[in-house]
């Protein structure tokens, strides 16, 4: 591991390899490159001190460098212990940007690195958060509540919370008042994923959101592209790299049929698997059925499945009882943000054999084995390299626009959760059309007037679902 005073990466000598892949990724990320072209001279993020917690991949490296081109100072950590691409982290560290990310972190390292993205050399706080899953945001908010005397650290509900709470106590002892000062300095947060957005809406509902937030996840050019088309390519990539199993003809169960579930089901079906879907929402269940998938319960389907993948953002989706029913060598994995979709903790007293990084064989007392990918964490990033650059360009362009909006127009927003306006969503899509050779039809003035829009858009109402 290579560590300096202000970065921690696996091996800084990987920087040259990372830079070569960054150069390729830039050609596949037209939205971010257009943002550099449009905003580079005006420096809208000059003065922004961004704490970023998002998978430290090659694509994220392009995002980081875009934020810097726009004037921001950045400190970065990964939002998942397995998702870092070490050569990407090295490439960013080599430019002088503080990054704290290693593939295969311990939980203690993870929360130490999350703390480090708020530790600036001058001792002053961050003023923006760019988050994926909400861990960076929750670290500051829970810490501030603890400093205010609330009893929020005495009853951890999981191993991860034990480590998180210990890190908060450590920071409170080292820097009294740190969390309260940091919370007050934040102008806003932009949140990448469904899980983190749910956390923000819960805070808003309780009146506990202390700064504005932009829900990047529910931009159409994020959720309908990254969540669907990204998973469509990266899920099967992760299963293949992890297991080398042939999916054609196998029975695969996808738990959940939201945007991630839809992409995952299509991914497995495209590989030739016979896909079944579980759902709690009757609308999503009907969509799955009419897309040609059998809608089942996991109680009924567990015993016949060869592959089971969770996509829900909920907890305890695959229980220990489900796993007891599964056949020998069933592959179990998750593509939702957190590892609690699968009851991995309930497997810890069984026999574990590590096959290779992020692939474990779990043996039950009766001799039956399961193949668990990435210890129940995001398998597309743990076992593979995540979504392709092109689809991440759309997501990350939304992040850049959200950061600019909250940093430059802070007073225009209340302490609530917002989505980017429709015209910016359409702008992000427009920036990606040329790369695919797509040409837009242009409405005449008469046609536009007939449907009540302008020829330049926006073309749909805010509630249109796409």
Swiss-Prot record:
Catalytic activity: S-adenosyl-L-homocysteine + H2O = L-homocysteine + adenosine
One GO-annotated biological process of the protein: S-adenosylmethionine cycle
Pathway the protein takes part in: Amino-acid biosynthesis; L-homocysteine biosynthesis; L-homocysteine from S-adenosyl-L-homocysteine: step 1/1
Family: Belongs to the adenosylhomocysteinase family.
CC annotations in GO: cytosol
Co-factor: note: Binds 1 NAD(+) per subunit.
Disulfide bridge partners, by residue number: none
PANTHER family: ADENOSYLHOMOCYSTEINASE
The protein's name: Adenosylhomocysteinase
UniProt keyword terms in alphabetical order: Cytoplasm, Hydrolase, NAD, One-carbon metabolism
Named cofactor requirement(s): NAD(+)
Function noted in UniProt: May play a key role in the regulation of the intracellular concentration of adenosylhomocysteine.
Record PROSITE patterns: ADOHCYASE_1, ADOHCYASE_2
Chain residues that bind NAD(+): 193-195, 227, 256-261, 279, 314, 335-337, 380
Catalytic class of the enzyme: hydrolase
Signal peptide segment: none
KW NAD (keyword) present: yes
Origin species: Brucella ovis (strain ATCC 25840 / 63/290 / NCTC 10512)
Keyword hit for NAD: yes
Pfam families: AdoHcyase, AdoHcyase_NAD
Primary location group: cytoplasm
Enzyme Commission code(s) on record: 3.13.2.1
MF GO annotations: adenosylhomocysteinase activity
Residues noted as binding substrate in the record, renumbered to the chain: 57, 132, 192, 222, 226
UniProt-annotated location(s): Cytoplasm
């Amino acid at each position: 591991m290579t560590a300096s005073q202000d970065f921690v990466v696996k091996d800084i000598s990987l920087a040259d390899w990372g830079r070569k892949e960054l150069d390729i990724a830039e050609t596949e990320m037209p939205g971010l490159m257009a943002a550099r072209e449009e905003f580079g001279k005006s420096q809208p993020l000059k003065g922004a001190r961004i704490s970023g917690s998002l998978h430290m991949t090659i694509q994220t490296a392009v995002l980081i460098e875009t934020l810097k081109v726009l004037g921001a100072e950045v400190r970065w950590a990964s939002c998942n212990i397995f998702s870092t691409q070490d050569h990407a982290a090295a490439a960013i560290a080599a430019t002088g940007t503080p990054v704290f990310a290693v593939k295969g972190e311990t939980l203690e390292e993870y929360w130490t690195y999350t703390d480090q993205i708020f530790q600036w050399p001058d001792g002053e706080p961050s003023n923006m958060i760019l988050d994926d899953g909400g861990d960076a945001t929750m670290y500051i908010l829970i810490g501030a509540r603890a400093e205010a005397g609330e009893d929020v650290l005495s009853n951890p509900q999981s191993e991860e919370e034990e480590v998180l709470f210990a890190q908060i106590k450590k920071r409170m002892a080292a820097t009294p008042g740190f969390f309260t000062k940091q919370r007050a300095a934040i102008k806003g947060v932009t949140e990448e994923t469904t899980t983190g957005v749910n956390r923000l809406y819960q805070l808003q509902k309780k009146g506990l959101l202390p700064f504005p937030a932009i829900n990047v996840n529910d931009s159409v050019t994020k959720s309908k592209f990254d969540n669907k088309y990204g998973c469509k390519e990266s899920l099967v990539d992760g299963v293949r790299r992890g297991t080398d199993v042939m999916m054609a003809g196998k029975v695969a169960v996808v738990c959940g049929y939201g945007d991630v579930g839809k992409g995952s089901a299509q991914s497995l079906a495209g590989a030739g698997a016979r896909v079944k879907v579980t759902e709690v929402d009757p609308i999503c269940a009907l969509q799955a059925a009419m897309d040609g998938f059998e809608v089942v319960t996991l109680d009924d389907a567990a015993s016949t499945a060869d592959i089971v993948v969770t996509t829900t953002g909920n907890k305890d989706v695959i229980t220990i009882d489900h796993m007891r029913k599964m056949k020998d060598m069933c592959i179990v994995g998750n593509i939702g943000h957190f590892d609690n979709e699968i009851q991995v903790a309930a497997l810890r007293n069984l026999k574990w054999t590590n096959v290779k990084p992020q692939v474990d064989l779990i043996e039950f007392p009766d001799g039956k084995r399961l193949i668990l990918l990435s210890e129940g964490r995001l398998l597309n990033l743990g076992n593979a390299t995540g979504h392709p650059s092109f689809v991440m360009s759309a997501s990350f362009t939304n992040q850049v626009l959200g950061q600019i909006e909250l940093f430059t127009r802070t007073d225009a927003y209340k302490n609530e959760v917002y989505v980017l306006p429709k015209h910016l969503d359409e702008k992000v899509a427009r920036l990606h059309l040329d790369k695919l050779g797509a040409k837009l039809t242009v409405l005449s003035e008469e046609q536009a007037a007939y449907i009540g829009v302008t020829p330049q858009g926006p073309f749909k109402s805010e509630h249109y679902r796409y």
